[in-house]
Design a protein with these regions (language model features):
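Extended active-site neighborhood of metal-dependent phosphoesterases/phosphodiesterases
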Residues: 29-129, 154, 160, 166, ...
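Conserved acidic residues
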Residues: 14, 131-133, 165
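Residue-level marker for buried hydrophobic side chains located in beta-strands
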Residues: 16-18, 48-49, 135, 168
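Acidic-and-aromatic substrate-binding clefts and catalytic sites of carbohydrate-active enzymes
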Residues: 23-29, 104-107, 142-149
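Short acidic, glycine-rich surface-loop motifs adjacent to enzyme active sites
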Residues: 19, 23, 123-145
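Active-site glycine-centered loops adjacent to acidic/histidine catalytic or metal-binding residues
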Residues: 20-21, 51-52, 138, 170-171
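N-terminal active-site segment of His-dependent metallophosphoesterases
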Residues: 1-29
Length: 208
């Protein structure tokens, strides 16, 4: 009961951020129906990214239709990703939510990258720019058990360019947190991006 532990530690939870694999078999409607019967999904606002399990049915058919239709998120993503990729403001922070499943080839990644550039630049240039920018996706920045670079290689030049403050990911089931990095090197923290990936709720694969 991870949420129960968090509530006992600090009951002032504003909302919940989920980094993908919300459901075991998200391509099957019954899993979303059962999810929203859970107490915490009634009581807390939450935002999440589409993970690979959120696409898979029990027959291994792939669809994110239920992720899109069962969750009420801003429809401000790019073509083909409305209701799956999205961005929002909370206080002085901007959150940009990505879908790795649509970035498996170069064309898919480039579409996502151009959208991130567009929405972050527009926000930075607005009359009320965010103080912090978070970018969230499911797949890990680094392979936690080896430290080998994963999605970091794809995204770090763009994050450096845009001044993204924090990059959040999941999937690897191992807690990883970098120093603040820019151009592949740790900085004094005044510039660069902090990369964090979260474990599963039971931390089944350890920490690094």
């Amino acid at each position: 009961d991870m949420m129960g532990v968090i509530e006992r530690y600090d009951p002032s939870i504003d909302w919940v951020l989920h980094l993908g694999d919300v459901c075991a078999w998200g391509g099957s409607y019954s899993f979303w129906r059962d999810l929203y019967k859970e107490d915490y999904f009634h009581r807390f606002m939450w935002a999440g990214v589409n993970g690979n399990h959120d696409n898979m049915s029990r027959k291994y058919q792939l669809t994110n239709a239920y992720f899109r239709d069962a969750n009420y998120v801003p429809r401000n993503g790019y073509e083909g990703e409305l209701g799956v990729c999205y961005h929002f403001r909370y206080g002085n922070a901007m959150f940009v939510m990505l879908n790795n499943e649509d970035m498996r080839d170069d064309a898919g990644f480039e579409a996502a990258a151009q959208w991130v550039r567009k929405v972050v630049t527009e926000a930075r240039q607005s009359s009320n720019p965010p103080q912090y920018v978070f970018v969230c996706e499911h797949y890990q920045w680094f392979m936690g058990h080896t430290g080998k670079k994963s999605q970091y290689n794809r995204w770090s030049p763009i994050f450096d360019e845009l001044g993204v403050d924090v990059a959040l990911a999941g999937n690897n089931h191992i807690y990883v947190r970098s120093g603040v990095l820019c151009d592949g090197k740790e900085t004094d923290g005044t510039r660069g991006t902090l990369y964090v990936q979260t474990p599963s709720a039971d931390n089944e694969r350890g920490m690094t």
